[in-house]
């Protein structure tokens, strides 16, 4: 359990400690590492306890704790997904325009703020619908969605804005980078 955040802590430590590594790229990498650390320290222990022995810790099943844990789980997962397009954008500018100023510090800070804001706003409905329920004489912490139009709209909007578009953006930048590198190789020959 203690080894889970170790890799991300090492990444965070090395990018913060070394002045050469204080760049826009590393701001995005630090953001990704922070999300991973938070998930491994907050969400993973909760999930392990629930999976291993649902009877052991009654306090986990309080409504507030249950809601906070599910909400944070969704936030950290969303931040992780949303960080990849920012890294892809930075890589795109670094490869295609290596000698120019790419993304400013202010813009990269704004992008990180946007990532966290988007993740929190997109995860708020989970906080609202999470509850403690009894299943087979055991309390469980779960999302209790009513299968309604509102739920369908939330799922569609969340998946489009937080999963599909970010993944598509990453693929787009990778294709553009590949195309640019292929074109530069053809010019050399």
Regions found by a protein language model. Give the residues of each.
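Residue-level signal for the membrane-embedded core of alpha-helical transmembrane segments
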Residues: 3-6, 76-83, 168-172
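Intracellular signaling interfaces of 7-transmembrane GPCRs
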Residues: 12, 17-27, 91-111, 171, ...
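Transmembrane helix-loop junctions and nearby membrane-interface residues
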Residues: 12-15, 44-51, 55, 123-134, ...
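Extracellular TM2-ECL1-early TM3 structural module of rhodopsin-like
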Residues: 25-87, 94-104
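Hydrophobic alpha-helical transmembrane segments of polytopic
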Residues: 32, 111-119
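Loop architecture of class A 7-transmembrane GPCRs
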Residues: 53-75, 97, 103, 108, ...
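Class A (rhodopsin-like) GPCR signature focused on the TM5-ICL3 interface and adjacent 7TM helical core
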Residues: 83-95, 127-136, 157-189
């Amino acid at each position: 359990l203690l080894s889970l955040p170790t890799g991300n802590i090492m990444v965070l430590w090395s990018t913060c400690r070394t002045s050469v590594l204080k760049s826009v790229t590393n701001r995005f990498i630090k953001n990704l590492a922070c999300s991973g650390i938070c998930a491994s320290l907050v969400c993973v222990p909760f999930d392990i306890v629930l999976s291993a022995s649902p009877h052991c810790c009654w306090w986990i099943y309080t409504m507030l704790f249950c809601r906070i844990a599910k909400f944070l789980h969704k936030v950290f997962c969303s931040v992780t997904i949303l960080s990849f397009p920012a890294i892809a954008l930075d890589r795109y500018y670094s490869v295609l325009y290596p000698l120019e100023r790419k993304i400013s510090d202010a813009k990269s800070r704004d992008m990180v703020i946007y990532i966290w804001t988007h993740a929190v706003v997109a995860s708020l409905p989970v906080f609202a619908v999470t509850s403690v329920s009894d299943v087979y004489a055991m309390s469980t912490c779960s999302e209790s969605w009513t299968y309604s139009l509102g739920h369908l709209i939330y799922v569609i909007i969340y998946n489009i804005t937080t999963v599909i578009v970010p993944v598509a953006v990453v693929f787009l930048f990778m294709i553009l980078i590949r195309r640019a590198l292929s074109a530069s190789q053809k010019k050399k020959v």
